[in-house]
Amino acid sequence: MKETILIILIFFNFTIVYNLKCGNDKLRHKPPGKLKEKSNSRRKLDNEYKPMKIKVDYTQVKIDTYNAPDVFEKLKISLDLATHYFELLLSIKGSDYEPLDHTILEEECSVDNVDPNSTNWLKEYDLIILPTYINETETNDVFASAYPCLVNDNDYKPVVGKVNILPNFDFNKNNIIIFLQTVLFHEITHFLVFHPFLLNHFNAIKIEIVGEEVKSYIVSPRVIEKARIHFGCNSLDKLPLEDQGGEGSAGSHWEGRYMLGDYMVSTSYDENVISDITLALFEDSGWYKPNYYTGGLFRFGKNIGCQFFENNCLIDQKAVFPNEFCDKSREPKCLSSHLGTGECYIGDYKSIMEIPSKYQYFKKEYLGGLVNVNFCPAANAYFESDSQKAHYFGTNCRYGASLNIFEHYGEVIGNKSLCFESSLVPRYSPQPYKWRSICYKMACDRINKKIIVFINDLNVTCPYNGGILKKVKGFKGKIKCPDYNLVCTSETWCNEMFECIDKKSETDYSTYILQNNEDL
């Protein structure tokens, strides 16, 4: 349930970004119902993991959208896609249950209408999803909510989940399908594993109380193993959960200060990526075996070391980790995954709230970054044009809209593009150059260990360790190159998390191994 799913209202200078929420605080607080397994059934005795099979019952949501068939069609396409990717991503051990009367589903999941033919669904499927389309709140800042409503009586594995989509989407916007798909992927994760009831069951959570402060951490073994590898910190023994934003965010999402960009933080930017760390949580539950190929798109905090957890994001008003954080409002900055463009976000909270003293990084104590990043200033999507505003993921390098202005010379939106911070313009240009975050087509030269950037008819070769190139043939201005190991170590190229799942067993040599610049 993507607790905060990005809607940005930006004016000038220091302003506040308001985020749409997922309705976790609207969820029922009683435990889910329980289903008993048959004893000694063939399906139960088969102890092998097999690809998950999911059944979606569209009975109620079709009724809810009776007067808007186009809305139903888009919801169905998006939910079918989201469930398809879970079937590719997760394997599960089979269980066998007694016949399931549809009235039990209606009662436990608070759904008025369930297909009466649901009795034997669990003979074939591992998970049932019941979607609805109901406005549960008087506000328009909530997108969706989800929870497990029936679990296995023995091991508490989720069997039936409900997801409610609220009518707060703009179904006429470009990219509505991929945006809905991403929201629903987040929501389904909540009733598969990332829900307080489920986390407590398999002892994934550790609670620490210091004074009046209560902090929740994930301490399960595979999560810690993957986190140690990603951050480069062998002594790491716990990973924080979100503690801001009330019930709708706290305790059911990763702490954005450390996991920004992962699809299970409480705010979505124009990037959503699956990390090995989140997949490890699925495995730690004991219910699932995940496919760990994620394309290496989660790049926030990669290889920084234990200091990432020991130091503040800003010291003396300067960013300690400049790849992750920033200290100049409106400064052009790529999102952490380099999947989208953005700028440094610093908001003025003076009339909104008092920033906790431990998160005050500026002399003006009312200035800070987004709430779910512990007010650390970081890159945030910023919509400059009407064409970008007409898109969900409007600043994404794969799905967004190019600005088509001279300062964005050479920009390409597409499936081989990443974000670069650049001020490059043609040398003949009479216009002054200035820094921008721009989407360029690029490739990873795995033979020579370099990044190649394509700007119209010219190629720019970035050094292995990255850094700022001050002189580029044919251009005036500069370009900041990311480290090769940050964006080019994956076996397969992808610049979108669902594409990464699709390519889990492929190798895209045309992108990676450059031979005489063919097919580029």
Language-model segments: what does each one mean?
Residues 515-520:
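Long, low-complexity intrinsically disordered regions of secretory-pathway proteins
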Residues 18-182, 190-514:
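Extracellular zinc-dependent metalloprotease catalytic-domain scaffold
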Residues 2-19:
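Cleavable N-terminal signal peptides of Sec/SRP-targeted secreted and luminal proteins
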